[in-house]
Amino acid sequence: MGLLDAKISNHNVLVTSVDNVLNWARLSSLWPMGFGLACCAIEMMATNASNYDLERFGIFPRSSPRQSDLMIVAGTVTMKMAERVIRLYEQMPEPRYVLSMGSCSNCGGPYWKHGYHVLKGVDRIIPVDVYVPGCPPRPEALIGGLMKVQELIRMEQIGISRVEALKKLEEKNIDPGQLIEDARKGAMAS
């Protein structure tokens, strides 16, 4: 009596799409690479500790960009460090995501006006998917940002990159934010 010999009943059948299965697998197993540069890195480390337990979300930190699918940029990115951030981003396999954590990586933080050596936001050198505000943000805020990344992954489709999808939306003059809201309402209605 093997698994193939068992009778299939209505309770054993699962109907879904390949997109949903792949997206579920990717969002249930995020492997972030933390790029801690300042005080935000301390909060990022606290999030990985036992009090918050990121492993319950399927999030396992990695130290190599070749093994990670999410880059968390936490802290002040200087002009000299920008080249290394780009290099690490390019070494990550597709699909890859970026979470910008804290005011310094979002917009330059307290150095935005007089800090000639500070990049005024990491989004000037690499594409950022989710911004987590704060100086430094609490671990709860980082967990909220990670859950937002999981929501983005849940809405992706096979064969269409995020860049292509956004270009198509721009050509049709459709607001992507409205589509996300419509998808959420549809998911809640069913």
Curated annotation (Swiss-Prot):
UniProt: [4Fe-4S] cluster binding residues: C39, C40, C104, C135
User: How would you describe this protein's topology in the membrane?
Assistant: Peripheral membrane protein
Molecular function in Gene Ontology: 4 iron, 4 sulfur cluster binding; iron ion binding; NADH dehydrogenase (ubiquinone) activity; NADH:ubiquinone reductase (non-electrogenic) activity; quinone binding
Which InterPro entries does this one have?
NADH_UbQ_OxRdtase-like_20kDa, NADH_UQ_OxRdtase_20Kd_su
**Keywords, ordered alphabetically:** 4Fe-4S, Cell inner membrane, Cell membrane, Iron, Iron-sulfur, Membrane, Metal-binding, NAD, Quinone, Translocase, Transport
Q: Which cofactor does it need?
A: [4Fe-4S] cluster
Q: Name one GO biological process term.
A: aerobic respiration
Please name the SUPFAM superfamilies in this protein's record.
HydA/Nqo6-like (SSF56770)
Name the major location: membrane
Q: Where in the cell is it found?
A: Cell inner membrane
Instruction: Copy out the cofactor comment.
Output: Binds 1 [4Fe-4S] cluster.
Q: For this protein, what is the EC number?
A: 7.1.1.-
Q: Which Pfam families match?
A: Oxidored_q6
Name any GO cellular component annotation.
respiratory chain complex I
Listed under catalytic activity are: a quinone + NADH + 5 H(+)(in) = a quinol + NAD(+) + 4 H(+)(out)
Looking up PANTHER family in the UniProt record yields:
NADH DEHYDROGENASE, NADH-QUINONE OXIDOREDUCTASE SUBUNIT B 2
Family under the similarity heading: Belongs to the complex I 20 kDa subunit family.
The function of this protein is: NDH-1 shuttles electrons from NADH, via FMN and iron-sulfur (Fe-S) centers, to quinones in the respiratory chain. The immediate electron acceptor for the enzyme in this species is believed to be a menaquinone. Couples the redox reaction to proton translocation (for every two electrons transferred, four hydrogen ions are translocated across the cytoplasmic membrane), and thus conserves the redox energy in a proton gradient.
Subunit note: NDH-1 is composed of 14 different subunits. Subunits NuoB, C, D, E, F, and G constitute the peripheral sector of the complex.
Listed name of the protein: NADH-quinone oxidoreductase subunit B
The record lists the organism as: Chlorobium phaeobacteroides (strain BS1)
